[in-house]
Amino acid sequence: MSEERIPKRSEVPEQFKWALEDIYATDEKWAEDLQKLKAMPERIAAFKGRLSESADTLYDFMQLSDEISVLCDSLGNYAQRRSDEDTANAKYQGFLGQLMNAYVAVNSAGSFETPEIISIEEDKLQKFYEDKPELKLYKRALDKLRRKKAHILSEAEEKILALTGEMGQSPENIYSMFSDADLRFPDAVDKDGKAHQVTHGSYIPLVQSDDRVLRKSAFESMYGTFDKFRNTCAATLSAQIKAVNFYAKARKYESSLEAALDGTEVPVSVYKNLIEAVHDNMHYMYDYVALRKKLLGVDELHFYDLYTPVVPDADMKITFEEAKETVLKALAPMGEDYLAILKEGFENRWIDVYENEGKTSGAYSAGARVHPYVLLNHKDTLNCMFTLAHEMGHAIHSYLSNKNQPVVYSDYVIFVAEVASTCNEALLMQYLLKNTEDKKQRAYLINYFLEQFRTTPVSYTHLTLPTTSRV
């Protein structure tokens, strides 16, 4: 793949594209299932006012909810993944719009669900479990729902909130289209006057260069462009903040932070303890940055100096094929069953590998009923190999959860999710250090791992400052 110019989607070889045909063979098949989803409000309405009627009725409704979840999973994964592979493709933006309209209709039709379920008396619900043992499958889900009784509104109010769903998503959608589909950055120029294309995918490799002129130029290209649209970005962020605050207040939470954490069953105190722990140990970060400044030999350390390795002449170029081989070896402690799933993902196009014009930036894993999908923007760097290990950790977690858990429990919260991914990163680092004798490369790897602490717990905690008292 060329590192100079980003290819169009049509120019990317098939083996490096994810196999979305595993969900739907054609767009027409997707449209057929969309019609099924559009018919769901009528089926949902048949249960209105009846959830406390009998164990059989409640069980049948929960089964219908599972059916809708599976249908939405397929429809949502196909439409979102198609849109993410080229955000400028209006066709799949249209798919997402149609799907969101159907989602809103389904959620609106089911607005009676939570008020009716929390109104069932505890003794009666226990009798339901006795009358129909199959209903016990949903006990934890029902208990979790009933735990939120203080934040559940009337049926009419719940319906209004359901109707705001598409509007609430707008700030995020606007920013995504602006950043991934519309924004273009001027080329960066190195010390020899050579131009380098700047994209979301190429930015980090550029600021990791040992050429300080190139690093500064790439930084000014990226952040200078965003700065030109600072009012647009600020207005979009403001709209997002207003949206989350609206939903928090509507549901009678003390704050948007409490509302966000409630669904994960994580107390606000745990979140605040994390922030305090990072702040109480920031002196280590200051020592590290001071050492970085000294090793780089610069009078002033700028933001564009933070990513370049402090170990000269030890850069590691790792192709995607090499990254796959190394990750397979590094994750051997996970066992043969785990490795078999990993190989299946590598060999059967679970991964969309390279950057192309309009492709969503960054990397992620998306669980799907057929199998997970992983979006990468691979650049043959050490960081990208760690990203592969990280995202495949999420992917295999999703695969195993979907395989072994009922539909209602197959999802998981982010606090659990990151264990599977960061464990893979730790195993990869352990493997690389164990199998690297060159002192410079070992130092390079240790520097990389230190950077993960700076760019993850430290940087992310810094981003929480506006939501806490530590400003």
Predicted regions and their residues:
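A well-structured
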Residues: 1-313
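Conserved small/polar residues in nucleotide/adenosyl-binding loops
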Residues: 461-467
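Post-HEXXH active-site segment of zinc metalloproteases
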Residues: 398-419
